[in-house]
Amino acid sequence: MDLAALRTQQQQLAASVERADRLDRDPPALIGGADVGFEQEGEVTRAAMVLLTWPELELVEYQVARVATTMPYIPGFLSFRETPALLAAWEQLSQKPDLLFVDGHGISHPRRLGVASHFGLMIDVPTIGVAKKRLCGKIGELGDEPGALAPLMDKNEQLAWVWRSKVRCNPLFISTGHRVGMDSALMWVERCMRGYRLPEPTRWADAVASRRPSFVRWQANHG
């Protein structure tokens, strides 16, 4: 595997990421959520995609796609491993969201191309990265209280907002994916909170992917 070529490709793609707001529909009618996991000891990549209405944040559609994993796990190159399954799930949706939350990083990546940015470029849809762990950069001083906020910085460049969404929970790393500004990304994540650590779009995507009780109950109520 030619990592140098992939690194160059990342740098070229990162230059095309739009870091300012460009939503085709504002406010959005549908907000999507995406989550990727792996099955069969990594041999299969599974992507879950959900659609929620705005502003109700009610789940109206979900799709799960499974594809053969074509690339090993290599730190910093995860988007090449995850985007084939994301694209398969995206293509199964009967409608497309106006804004998509992706479980993972956007520009808060060593080469400014996490999966939220990479996939956003592929489908040319506004995306927001919602990650649970830091990949690069330094966190400013962050309080312990819910709502505490600090920038994630690298070489005098802000890569993300580090935001503690709930008491006694690790913070989220919220970043521009594509066609959404940094402050707007934070605003939309805040607006999509309903008392959990994660915003509803990625919380539901995770629930669908892992068949959590909340999703099982939803299925029972919706046939």
From Swiss-Prot:
Organism superkingdom: Bacteria
EC numbers, comma separated: 3.1.21.7
Catalyzed reaction equations: Endonucleolytic cleavage at apurinic or apyrimidinic sites to products with a 5'-phosphate
Molecular-function GO terms, alphabetical: deoxyribonuclease V activity; magnesium ion binding; RNA endonuclease activity, producing 5'-phosphomonoesters; single-stranded RNA binding
Keywords in alphabetical order: Cytoplasm, DNA damage, DNA repair, Endonuclease, Hydrolase, Magnesium, Metal-binding, Nuclease
Positions of the record's site feature: Interaction with target DNA: Y73
UniProt KW Cytoplasm keyword: yes
Cofactor: Mg(2+)
EC class of the enzyme, as a word: hydrolase
Chain residues that bind Mg(2+): D35, D103
Localization terms from the record: Cytoplasm
GO CC, alphabetical: cytoplasm
Database matches in Pfam families: Endonuclease_5
GO biological process: DNA repair
Function: DNA repair enzyme involved in the repair of deaminated bases. Selectively cleaves double-stranded DNA at the second phosphodiester bond 3' to a deoxyinosine leaving behind the intact lesion on the nicked DNA.
UniProt similarity note: Belongs to the endonuclease V family.
Listed PANTHER family: ENDONUCLEASE V
Protein name as annotated: Endonuclease V
Species this chain originates from: Klebsiella pneumoniae (strain 342)
Gene of this entry: nfi
